[in-house]
Amino acid sequence: MAPVVQQPAPSFKKTAVVDGVFEEVTLEQYKGKWVLLAFIPLAFTFVCPSEIIAYSEAVKKFAEKDAQVLFASTDSEYTWLAWTNVARKDGGIGKVDFPVLADTNHSLSRDYGVLIEEEGVALRGIFLIDPKGVLRQITINDLPVGRSVEESLRLLEAFQFTEKYGEVCPANWHPGDETIKPSPEASKEYFNKVNK
């Protein structure tokens, strides 16, 4: 069964490349933190390195928000390691500042509902998991289009805001923007401000 927002995220234990070495990584080790789990189809391709590099360059922004970034593919840990040893200018990913998970048996991709069975690769899924291990947001792209780091950060900040303050975030919300008190009467305050 595919994962569902508001339900516990599927647990996992996978071998990952972390700072150039192999380590076992589990979802449970990040309990108490936000987790952004992203899937890519294949190493040594075209859109995939652009995404990994973009998220790696923004990893400090995620860390400042108490969020751990993880990437996964159906490639082996050896493929991931080889890819980190190729310079970015040559299509590699170089040093990556988050764990990259090897899903060689496809269980992780299947559990998260992104596996294209006949091809043995994952769709471009992003899963935002809260500190309790509950799925809060799912986005799945078809293979040819990469994801936006800015949108991932915006969604993380919006969910964190709603958790902290109990208000809800309207379309295109960014930190500092007006929010909505979730009741028919109180919400009028927001709508009166933005719809003059």
From Swiss-Prot:
Region (Disordered): 173-196
Loss of function: phenotype: Results in delayed hyphal development and enhanced sensitivity to cell wall-perturbing agents, yet does not impair virulence in vivo.
Localisation per UniProt entry: Cell surface; Nucleus; Cytoplasm
Chief place of localization: other
Keywords: Antioxidant, Cytoplasm, Disulfide bond, Nucleus, Oxidoreductase, Peroxidase, Redox-active center
CC terms in the record's Gene Ontology section: cell surface; cytoplasm; cytosol; fungal-type cell wall; hyphal cell wall; nucleus
Catalytic activity: a hydroperoxide + [thioredoxin]-dithiol = an alcohol + [thioredoxin]-disulfide + H2O
Ranges for domain Thioredoxin: 3-161
Record-linked InterPro entries: AhpC/TSA (IPR000866), Peroxiredoxin (IPR050217), Peroxiredoxin_AhpC-typ (IPR024706), Peroxiredoxin_C (IPR019479), Thioredoxin-like_sf (IPR036249), Thioredoxin_domain (IPR013766)
Record-annotated active site: C48 (cysteine sulfenic acid (-soh) intermediate)
Biological processes annotated in GO: biological process involved in interaction with host; cell redox homeostasis; cellular response to hydrogen peroxide; cellular response to oxidative stress; filamentous growth; filamentous growth of a population of unicellular organisms in response to chemical stimulus; filamentous growth of a population of unicellular organisms in response to starvation; fungal-type cell wall organization
Transmembrane domains' residue ranges: none
Residues the record lists as binding substrate: T45, F46, V47, R124
Enzyme Commission number, as recorded: 1.11.1.24
Class of this enzyme: oxidoreductase
Inducing stimuli: Induced by oxidative stress.
Keyword Signal annotated: no
Molecular function GO labels: high molecular weight kininogen binding; thioredoxin peroxidase activity
Composition-biased stretches (Basic and acidic residues): 175-196
Superkingdom of the organism of origin: Eukaryota
Function per UniProt: Thiol-specific peroxidase that catalyzes the reduction of hydrogen peroxide and organic hydroperoxides to water and alcohols, respectively. Plays a role in cell protection against oxidative stress by detoxifying peroxides and as sensor of hydrogen peroxide-mediated signaling events. Also involved in the correct composition of the hyphal cell wall.
Note: The active site is a conserved redox-active cysteine residue, the peroxidatic cysteine (C(P)), which makes the nucleophilic attack on the peroxide substrate. The peroxide oxidizes the C(P)-SH to cysteine sulfenic acid (C(P)-SOH), which then reacts with another cysteine residue, the resolving cysteine (C(R)), to form a disulfide bridge. The disulfide is subsequently reduced by an appropriate electron donor to complete the catalytic cycle. In this typical 2-Cys peroxiredoxin, C(R) is provided by the other dimeric subunit to form an intersubunit disulfide.
The protein's assembly and partners: Homodimer; disulfide-linked, upon oxidation.
UniProt similarity note: Belongs to the peroxiredoxin family. AhpC/Prx1 subfamily.
Protein name as annotated: Peroxiredoxin TSA1-A
Natural source organism: Candida albicans (strain SC5314 / ATCC MYA-2876) (Yeast)
Phylogenetic placement of the source organism: Eukaryota, Fungi, Dikarya, Ascomycota, Saccharomycotina
Gene name of this polypeptide: TSA1
